[in-house]
Amino acid sequence: MTIHYEELNGKNFNTYSLDHFVRHQRVIECWRNVDGQWKLIPIEFEENWTVEQCQKIAADVALHMGNDQTAIGAFDGEEVIGFITVSHNIFGNTAKYVELVCFQVSEPYRGKKIGKTLFYKACEEAKRLGADKLYISAHSSKESQAAYKAIGCVHACLLYTSPSPR
């Protein structure tokens, strides 16, 4: 397995590029703010993207890449096995933020530092765009939050409750 990373464009990414992507997550607990304290609450569900959902996400990535977002892909051969997108819109009063819009690694490739590499590439892109920080609105599951914490993320000083800054 030789993984390579490159910016997504019309030559290496299209609506069908995620047809074999495995977006699966079994959630048992999620973080919730209860009376001002973060607590793990039992919330069980399973997420599985269908091919149609993968195509919808891919079409959205393709629409924005190179325009108002930068998209970076992780490839195993020619197959997209992970991707991350960063908005070009800088916002914020206390710091210059850009939003990490989408961040996914196909299930068979998790735990291999592919997500960490993609995340660091997104940080480099944010700096290139002139931002100080990435704004991340992440899944509240125990596992997702642990993954972000493991790569050095902390709770934001700036919180948007709605709508997304995009």
PLM feature spans:
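Conserved active-site alpha-helix within GNAT-family acetyltransferase domains
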Residues: S140-L158
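Conserved acetyl-CoA-binding loop-helix of GNAT-fold acetyltransferases
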Residues: G111-E124
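Acetyl-CoA-dependent GNAT
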Residues: H20-K96, V101, S106, Y120
